[in-house]
């Protein structure tokens, strides 16, 4: 699963997830993309589950790009531990997702297969997504 090799600090503040995505909001590498319509958090497990679903559907042909990376640690205190005594240990890693962010890209397959693969991937994700194509410049 994806997670940073090194971080300057082990734990982070929560922070707010506001605004729209400006960076990573267009299809850059492939021909087709899966774009988020809502804000939310995407865990490393969800990123991997969606990638596996797409890869299996396209039968390993074409190329898939993952455009997001889980760089935010989420901490959790153990069960039945009283409040206080510091912040809990890192449980998993997430990526903050803003509306308009391209999550995955694909090329080398037909549009019909890409749509089906992205539909399978979207069912693994906790927010609404849409299918987008690369616009000619």
UniProtKB/Swiss-Prot annotation:
SUPFAM superfamilies: Ribosomal protein L16p/L10e (SSF54686)
GO cellular component, one term: cytosolic large ribosomal subunit
Highest taxon, organism lineage: Bacteria
UniProt xrefs under InterPro entries: Ribosomal_uL16 (IPR047873), Ribosomal_uL16_bact-type (IPR000114), Ribosomal_uL16_CS (IPR020798), Ribosomal_uL16_dom (IPR016180), Ribosomal_uL16_sf (IPR036920)
GO MF: rRNA binding; structural constituent of ribosome; tRNA binding
HAMAP family: Ribosomal_uL16
Subunit text: Part of the 50S ribosomal subunit.
Protein name: Large ribosomal subunit protein uL16
Originating species: Colwellia psychrerythraea (strain 34H / ATCC BAA-681) (Vibrio psychroerythus)
Lineage of source species: Bacteria, Pseudomonadati, Pseudomonadota, Gammaproteobacteria, Alteromonadales
């Amino acid at each position: 699963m994806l997670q940073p090799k090194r971080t300057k600090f082990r734990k982070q503040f929560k922070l707010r997830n506001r605004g729209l995505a400006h960076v990573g909001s267009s299809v850059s590498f492939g021909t087709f993309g899966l774009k988020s319509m809502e804000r939310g958090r995407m865990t490393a497990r969800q990123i991997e589950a969606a990638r596996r679903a797409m890869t299996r559907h396209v039968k390993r042909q074409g190329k898939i790009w993952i455009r997001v990376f889980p760089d935010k640690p989420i901490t959790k205190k153990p069960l039945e531990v009283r409040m206080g005594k510091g912040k809990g240990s890192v449980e998993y890693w997430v990526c903050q997702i803003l509306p308009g962010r391209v999550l995955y890209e694909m090329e080398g397959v037909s549009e019909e297969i890409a749509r089906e693969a992205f539909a399978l991937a979207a069912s693994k994700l906790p927010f609404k997504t849409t299918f987008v194509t690369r616009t000619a410049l």
